């Protein structure tokens, strides 16, 4: 039976600890739920290190561990906490190789969550890391993608920001690109918006809108393939990049790169430019299939 993404992550962490490759650090790791069931039931003597509830200190501790020869997995239970966790990772771990020839490889498991989690904790925040040199960013939404991300990290010497989303943890399916000879739009979905694509295809079929879908695993470095650019050039109304982060962030940069390479208009659709509240009436959620198709219809109909 195929494993879920949740089970895949749990197996990776367990093997990482049991094989002596490194420790796992974070807050409330061994609390009820074991971070959404993505951690094995291991404890400090096994390498599961509980950090104090001081978010700024956590990033510094794992940076120090990496400099000392550990290859830490750092679990950040809500991506919004990266405003505190990122300081030492960005300003030391990501820069030390270029400046001093030392390395600090850290596997940052940064977990996004949407719906009623308020103005700080919710949504994805990979744009915080995106503009800084010396690190890589991936957003795996499938089991094979996560295995690839981990194995790539283990063969590298830089910090990796792994942008996860809790709503993907039950996923067992791999996500395949759909590229037609001609289309109205080419969609470049990132993070949890990728799991809206199956529903979006059905909605587009009912509205006679033809789309290409090119799933995005790598956020940084973003290197567009020739096939993607050809797909954009063959799309009547251009493309759109969707994400669970604000539009004034990495998706704006990615859309610009795609637009320059293809000479086509590439739009962005992410979080609205406002603060999320706890109540559903004031929440700020990533674009779902309905919101995406409404956006496409506005463009198509002029």
Model feature map: region roles:
Residues 1-159, 163, 165-302, ...:
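Thiamine diphosphate
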């Amino acid at each position: 039976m195929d494993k879920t993404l949740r089970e895949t992550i749990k197996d990776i962490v367990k093997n990482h600890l049991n094989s002596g490759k490194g420790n796992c650090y974070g807050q409330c790791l061994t609390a009820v739920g074991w971070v959404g069931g993505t951690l094995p039931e291991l404890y400090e003597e096994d390498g599961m290190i509980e950090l104090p509830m001081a978010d700024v200190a956590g990033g510094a501790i794992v940076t120090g561990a990496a400099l000392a020869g550990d290859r830490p997995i750092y679990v950040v239970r809500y991506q919004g906490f990266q405003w505190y966790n990122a300081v030492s990772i960005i300003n030391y771990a990501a820069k030390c190789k270029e400046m001093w020839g030392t390395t600090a490889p850290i596997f940052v498991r940064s977990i996004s969550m949407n719906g009623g989690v308020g103005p700080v904790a919710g949504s994805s925040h990979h744009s915080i890391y995106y503009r800084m040199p010396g690190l890589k960013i991936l957003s795996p939404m499938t089991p094979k993608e996560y295995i690839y991300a981990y194995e790539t990290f283990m063969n590298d010497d830089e910090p990796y920001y792994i942008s996860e989303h809790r709503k993907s943890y039950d996923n067992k399916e791999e996500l395949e690109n759909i590229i037609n000879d001609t289309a109205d739009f080419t969609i470049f979905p990132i993070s949890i918006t990728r799991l809206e694509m199956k529903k979006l295809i059905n909605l587009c079929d009912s509205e006679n809108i033809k789309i290409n879908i090119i799933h995005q695993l790598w956020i940084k470095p973003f290197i567009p393939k020739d096939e993607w650019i050809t797909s954009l050039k063959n799309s009547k109304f251009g493309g759109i990049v969707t994400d669970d982060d604000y539009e004034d962030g990495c998706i704006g940069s990615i859309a610009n790169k795609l637009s320059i390479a293809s000479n086509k208009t590439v739009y962005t659709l992410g979080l609205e430019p406002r603060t999320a509240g706890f109540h559903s009436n004031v929440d700020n959620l990533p674009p779902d299939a309905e919101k995406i198709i409404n956006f496409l219809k506005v463009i198509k109909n002029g």
